From Swiss-Prot:
Family: Belongs to the Integrator subunit 14 family.
Coiled-coil ranges per UniProt: none
Keywords: Acetylation, Magnesium, Metal-binding, Nucleus
Binding site for Mg(2+): 10, 12, 86
Protein name: Integrator complex subunit 14
Annotated Gene Ontology cellular component terms: INTAC complex; integrator complex; nucleus
Major site of localization recorded for this protein: nucleus
């Protein structure tokens, strides 16, 4: 999931820190050191993740928009200036704006807030914001909870004793509570020094940025993979004492099924499945990135020459048009499938079903599915013309078909011109002419645009009078017939599902296309 790093650059972050040695450090230097450690870890293990950098004092500024270039993020850390007082609310408002603008309100996001625990003074301070949050209108509401799924991690450049001497810790804990309890506060254990800052950011990495490695198994075949993004624990609301369910690190394929049978099932989340190549010494080759481009290229070349079950599975699913059912845990399944990014690129994906013995009702209980060879006769038929599972409804779903949209006048003009072009090529274009005519008729009836039907009918009658002497006799009959049917469709007795069919005449030959 995307990450927004929010860095405090107020004057309080310039307070000096007594560190052993001659070099003088400020709290912002400790924060930059910790963030550098985080960015280096993400560049190695989370290189597909998008990260943005925001700085704030009384105002906020987007230093680096969402990017996968962690060198740019690290350069921005060394180019930050010092500003005035702390105003956390403005920073949180900025986070809301940039996340919603880039990702909308449905994509989960992690927010890493780096501050020294100073809440600001006067109007705009966190104390003032929390004290007045219940006295505001909807237009000026406090930005927490975020309007998107999120986790808020507060990294304090202060130890616990320093925060407890004031009400800073209590106010910061209130932020986590306002975000529906999603998040955590981290403080420095012991004196402020580089080592303890590394330890604090290490705890954040262990909690939120540890890559999920698993073993993908199918019979005797196995492959080490990374699942990205990391699957989150799932809590079943119906249970009296809900316990978060975590997927196993052993992902076992239990069977294969046609894409048409599984259709488009409801899923909890979707993840990339990336192979991890190991060399003979057991070190990872295909995961992460190296500092030197030549070393990276040579490592990728070595990884590409090693046979990998993950690659075999991906290619097989893509060619055969099937998905693999995978066991995630006790009574918990998912599916592996090939998803195309473009015409030339596709990825192996894994979607997680809801836990339970029967996540997809039309398949029945997962434990009762078996191989085709166990059936007395092929449940798909000899010609693969039937399915053992309940058939999908014949009516097309509204979201699964191309609909006619006339937002701009040019769209309507294009559809009318298409009908007229086909009308001039009758009878060769009879089938296409009536197809476009029926599409326009249904759209006009759906929108209540009856005047359009009358106007197109008049155009067709005019086209009939302009036919040259060399025109096929059937063209005039078809145009007159189509115009009459459109006029009937503009009355209150019109039937939406009725299609206008070609008029059968004695002039209709084998060259005329039939509906």
């Amino acid at each position: 999931m995307p990450t927004v790093v929010v860095m405090d650059v107020s004057l309080s972050m310039t307070r000096p820190v007594s560190v052993e040695g001659s070099e003088e450090y400020q709290r912002k230097h400790l924060a930059a050191h910790g963030l550098t450690m985080l960015f280096e870890h993400m560049a190695t293990n989370y290189k597909l993740e998008f990260t943005a950098l925001v700085v704030f004092s009384s105002l906020w500024e987007l230093m680096v928009p969402f990017t996968r270039d962690y060198n740019t993020l690290q350069e921005a850390l060394s180019n930050m200036d010092d500003y005035d007082k702390t105003c956390l609310e403005s920073a949180l408002v900025g986070v809301c704006n940039i996340v919603q603008q880039e990702w909308g309100g449905a994509i989960p996001c992690q927010v890493v807030l780096v501050t020294d625990g100073c809440l600001g003074i006067g109007r705009g301070s966190l104390r003032h914001s929390l004290a007045t949050q219940n006295q505001r209108s909807e237009s000026s509401r406090f930005p927490l909870p975020f309007p998107f799924p999120s986790k808020l991690y507060v990294m304090c450049m202060a130890n616990l004793e320093e925060l407890q001497s004031t009400d800073s810790l209590e106010c910061l804990e209130r932020l986590i509570d306002l975000n529906n309890g999603e998040g955590q506060i981290f403080t420095i254990d012991g004196p402020l020094c580089l080592k303890n800052v590394q330890s604090m950011f290490g705890k954040l990495i262990d909690l939120a940025y540890t890559p999920f490695h698993a073993a993908l198994k199918c019979g005797h075949l196995t492959a080490d993979v990374q699942v990205f993004p990391r699957p989150e624990p799932f809590v079943i609301d119906e249970e009296i004492d809900p316990i978060p369910k975590v997927i196993n690190t052993d992902l076992e394929i239990v069977g294969f099924i046609d894409i048409a049978d599984i259709s488009s099932p409801p899923v909890l989340s979707r993840h990339l499945v990336l192979p991890i190549a190991l060399n003979k010494e057991g070190d990872e080759v295909g995961a992460g990135i190296t500092d030197d481009n030549e070393d990276e290229n040579s490592a990728n070349q070595i990884a590409g020459k090693i046979p990998n079950f993950c690659v075999l599975l991906h290619g097989s699913l893509k060619v055969e048009g099937m998905v693999a059912l995978v066991q995630l845990g006790p009574e918990w399944h998912g599916m592996l499938y090939s998803q195309a990014d473009s015409k030339k690129k596709s990825n192996l994906m894994m979607s997680l079903f809801e836990p339970g013995p029967e996540p997809l009702p039309w398949l029945g209980k997962m434990a009762q599915l078996g191989p085709i060879s166990d059936a007395k006769e092929n449940p798909y038929g000899e010609d693969d013309n039937k399915s053992p599972f309940p058939l999908q409804p014949k009516n097309k779903r509204s979201y699964a078909q191309n609909v006619t949209v006339w937002i701009k006048p040019s769209g309507l003009q294009t559809d009318v011109q298409k009908i007229l072009r086909n009308a001039r090529k009758l009878p060769e274009k009879t089938q296409t002419f009536y197809k476009e005519l029926n599409r326009l008729r249904k759209a006009a009836l759906a929108f209540g645009f009856l005047d359009l039907l009358k106007g197109v009918a008049d155009m067709l009658e005019r086209e009939c009078t302009l036919l040259p002497d060399t025109a096929h006799p059937d063209a005039a009959f078809q145009l007159t017939h189509a115009a009459q049917q459109l006029k009937l469709a503009s009355t209150e007795y019109a039937v939406y599902d009725l299609n206008i069919t070609p008029l059968h005449t004695d002039f209709s030959g084998s060259s005329t296309e039939r509906m």
